[in-house]
Amino acid sequence: MHSAKLIDHTLLKPESTRTQIDQIIDEAKAYHFKSVCVNPTHVKYAAERLADSEVLVCTVIGFPLGASTTATKAFETEDAIQNGADEIDMVINIGALKDGRFDDVQQDIEAVVKAAKGHTVKVIIETVLLDHDEIVKASELTKAAGADFVKTSTGFAGGGATAEDVKLMKDTVGADVEVKASGGVRNLEDFNKMVEAGATRIGASAGVQIMQGLEADSDY
C-alpha cells in the first residue's frame, strides 16, 4: 500500500480554526492521505469539502479523556456518522480498565461499535497511562468488542506512540485487528519505526513532513 494511505492527517487542537481545517483538507487531497481526523464540530464541514475525494473523514469520541458515559459516547458516534464521519476513534474508560472492571470497558467499546453501524472503529487505549499488562488487556478487550483497530494515544496525555507498545499491541490482537500509532510521529524515521513494529495506520499532524521525507528518500 502507498505510504500516504497509512496516514490519518490529524488536527485535534481545541483552538483549530476553519482556515486550519481547510489547510489539512487541502493537504490530504494533495497527498492522498487515508483520512483527515478532526474534532466532531468540524465533521460536517470536512465531509462536505471531501465529498468528491477518496479522503475519508475520521473523528474522535469521548476525547481526550475517555470519561464520558457509554450512552454519551454512543450518541456522539451516531451524531458523527449522521454528519458524514467515515471512521470513529474512541477513547476507552481508562479508570475502569485500571479498576479491573473489564466488562464495563468492553461494553463501552461495544456500544460505540454498534452505534457506528459498520463504520471503522479505532479504540484509543492511552498507552502512556498503562503498564504492560494493562496494554495487553486493553488490546484484548478491543478485539473482543469487535473494533477494527487498537490505537496507542490521544496525544493529550503527555506521551505518544512507541514502537515497543505498537509491537505489543499487534502481538496481542494478531491478524484480526489492526494497530494505529499516534502521538509524537513527527518524521519519516518515526513513521518507519511504527510501520515496522506493526502499525497499519499512523495518526499524525506531520503527514506532509513524512511525505516530504519519503519523496527525498531514494527508496521512494
Curated annotation (Swiss-Prot):
Active site per UniProt: D89 (proton donor/acceptor), K151 (schiff-base intermediate with acetaldehyde), K180 (proton donor/acceptor)
Molecular function (Gene Ontology), one example: deoxyribose-phosphate aldolase activity
Keywords noted in UniProt: Cytoplasm, Lyase, Schiff base
Entry's EC annotation: 4.1.2.4
Cystine pairs: none
GO BP: 2-deoxyribose 1-phosphate catabolic process; carbohydrate catabolic process; deoxyribonucleotide catabolic process
The keyword Mitochondrion appears for this protein: no
Location of this chain's protein in the cell: Cytoplasm
Keyword Lyase annotated: yes
Gene3D superfamilies named among the record's database cross-references: Aldolase class I (3.20.20.70)
Enzyme category, top tier: lyase
Database matches in InterPro entries: Aldolase_TIM, DeoC, DeoC/FbaB/LacD_aldolase, DeoC_typeI
Pathway per the UniProt entry: Carbohydrate degradation; 2-deoxy-D-ribose 1-phosphate degradation; D-glyceraldehyde 3-phosphate and acetaldehyde from 2-deoxy-alpha-D-ribose 1-phosphate: step 2/2
Primary subcellular site in the record, as a coarse category: cytoplasm
Record's catalysed reaction(s): 2-deoxy-D-ribose 5-phosphate = D-glyceraldehyde 3-phosphate + acetaldehyde
GO cellular component: cytoplasm
Ranges in a coiled coil: none
Functional description taken from the UniProt entry: Catalyzes a reversible aldol reaction between acetaldehyde and D-glyceraldehyde 3-phosphate to generate 2-deoxy-D-ribose 5-phosphate.
HAMAP family: DeoC_type1
Family from the record: Belongs to the DeoC/FbaB aldolase family. DeoC type 1 subfamily.
UniProt-listed NCBIfam families: deoC (TIGR00126)
Record protein name field: Deoxyribose-phosphate aldolase 2
Organism the protein comes from: Staphylococcus aureus (strain MSSA476)
Gene name, Swiss-Prot/TrEMBL: deoC2
